[in-house]
Amino acid sequence: MFLALLYLALPLADVLLSAEVSGLPGGDRLDCVKASDQCLKEQSCSTKYRTLRQCVAGKESNFSRATGLEAKDECKSAMEALKQKSLYNCRCKRGMKKEKNCLRIYWSMYQSLQGNDLLEDSPYEPVNSRLSDIFRLAPIVSVEPVLSKGNNCLDAAKACNLNDTCKRFRSAYITPCTSSTSNEICNKRKCHKALRLFFDKVPPKHSYGMLFCSCRDVACTERRRQTIVPVCSYEDREKPNCLNLQESCKKNYICRSRLADFFTNCQPESRSVSSCLKENYADCLLAYSGLIGTVMTPNYIDSSSLSVAPWCDCSNSGNDIDECRKFLNFFQDNTCLKNAIQAFGNGTDVNVWQPILPVQTTTATTTTASRLKNTGSETTNNEIPTHNDSPACANLQAQKKRKSNESVDTELCLNENAIGKDNTPGVSTSHISSENSFALPTSFYPSTPLILMTIALSLFLFLSSSVVL
């Protein structure tokens, strides 16, 4: 009898599991604009929300002088009450119609719940795309360009001109980024805005094709470096201190959010197969491109490597020199980002067939500095392996080949560290395709509450049948 009841309970458990999977990570989660509107229509939520906004804005300061702990308790009470509302878990979408307003609402909540100095949690709804999805739509960045002897970045620019959307938005940023004004080289504000629109609106198969194209020679890499018109969008008369630039970025909702997204999705992890904590190259490249058009705009440092950095340095850092270097090194020596750029240029992706060992991570309440220290001693050698070693794409594919006993293709991974040494690409051992892979997402595995619910249901049915008998 018990086995029969268990047999009946299992389909129900499967339904519950499916519901949980479909609800993660976003499910019915609202964007912050809709969540705010919904909250303001409910009297109890509206009252708590208005109180919280006053707390965030600092308008409670005069009130707190009069009532002391009572004011703090009221802020805390409002915060706890809103944790039960959809506003608590709201997110925004990059390039959405009311993005800035959405981000303002998100940060008003986040600053109250977590503090004002954190950048780790991205306010954007996860996209969870794969490079392989882009490759299926983009012949120009597939295997053929890697083997060609032409200029891939030039080919990508030509492909952009053949696409109406890409051509329109590219022209829209070229004009303000190259038009000088009376006192300045260009109007940087208009240039930045147009660049953001380009990377937000143009399909990655075209925008990434110009920004992350693989190169064999300096002419190609220099064209890649010039993609964002750095003389206007990137360079300035003087380099500010990186920590000061970070503070300026945090004062702008768009910049702060894009930087948080970059820290979240390009976090290096030396123990992972891809050198990325999240094992997703596409999300890292999306986060990186999202910074372009903000005061934290990054670009390739020179024409001989994949190292990138914002326009800043660590001079005049004083006692904060270590923190400044960690911040700057997150850009310059980021193995995850470098591997992602190289993978896109090679037409490869993370091998999701390879089982990943669990990685212990820090919580969302760690500070930016403590999060960046993970890029220290464990990742001091962050350069992409030279042609004498197997680069990330070769290592990943070799693992897949060993599982299937297939031979390893030795032609399709291009290593840009060989640029300048000779006129042939560094040879690696393989080309990766994750098109047919089916690694299960983390959200697939049942949660503890769901397991307990299933067990309780089975036990209840068993006891009920016993009473009947």
Swiss-Prot record:
Keywords: Cell membrane, Disulfide bond, Endosome, Glycoprotein, Golgi apparatus, GPI-anchor, Lipoprotein, Membrane, Receptor, Repeat, Signal
Pfam families per the UniProt record, alphabetical: GDNF (PF02351)
GO molecular function, one term: signaling receptor activity
Sequence ranges of the Sequence repeats: 28-116, 149-237, 238-341
Signal peptide positions (record): 1-27
Glycan attachment positions: 62, 163, 346, 405
Positions of disulphide bridges: 39-45, 153-213, 160-166, 177-191, 186-232, 215-220, 242-312, 249-255, 266-284, 276-336, 314-324
Prosegment residue ranges: 431-469
Gene Ontology biological process: glial cell-derived neurotrophic factor receptor signaling pathway; nervous system development
Residues with lipidation of kind GPI-anchor amidated serine: 430
Places the protein is found: Cell membrane; Golgi apparatus, trans-Golgi network; Endosome; Endosome, Multivesicular body
Superkingdom: Eukaryota
InterPro entries: GDNF/GAS1, GDNF_alpha, GDNF_rcpt, GDNF_rcpt_A1, Glial_neurotroph_fac_rcpt_a1/2
Membrane topology term: Lipid-anchor; GPI-anchor
GO annotations of cellular component type: external side of plasma membrane; Golgi apparatus; multivesicular body; receptor complex
Main function: Coreceptor for GDNF, a neurotrophic factor that enhances survival and morphological differentiation of dopaminergic neurons and increases their high-affinity dopamine uptake. GDNF-binding leads to autophosphorylation and activation of the RET receptor.
Protein family according to the UniProt entry: Belongs to the GDNFR family.
Subunit description: Interacts with GDNF ligand and RET: forms a 2:2:2 ternary complex composed of GDNF ligand, GFRA1 and RET receptor.
Name used for this protein in its record: GDNF family receptor alpha-1
Gene (UniProt): GFRA1
